[in-house]
Amino acid sequence: DKDWYGTIPLGIIVTDKMIFTVCLEDTQVLTRFMEGRVRSFFTYMKTRFIFQILYRNASMYLRYLRIIDKKSEQVEEKLHLSTRNEELIELLELQKSLTYFITSLRSNEVVLEKLLKIDSIKKYPEDTDLLEDVITENKQAIEMANVYSGILNGTMDAFASIISNNMN
């Protein structure tokens, strides 16, 4: 089990005949597409394909945010029992992950809002609805990340004070 989660850029390049994705590592965002496990997935419907990738991306953020929340609760339980610096460091790593998530999600939000306003890209009838769903998922992920970050900051401050008091 990882104690932190990071983000990596994923580029999508669209030409007349192809769609390229560029990433420094293999990414789970694209795995389901490559395995043929995404319904209504057609590469010739370029805009929809891009929106499906973005939806999968937002969904994965939500999934990992829930994992981070559970992990922080587990670490907090351990802190209640031991009050060691080690658990505080684990919480710090989770907080760092949330900071990366928030930064990345906010960048995604700007791109998604621009995609909604651009008329020059071909959209199929359901594409606008799908893009709006992506925007909703992304906004939900931003809110969750902000809430979890606030809770984690408060928890770390409280336990740091407890540890400091115990040492005095």
Where are each of the predicted segments found?
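Extended alpha-helical interaction modules
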Residues: 1-89, 113
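Membrane-associated alpha-helical segments
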Residues: 17, 57, 73-76, 80-168
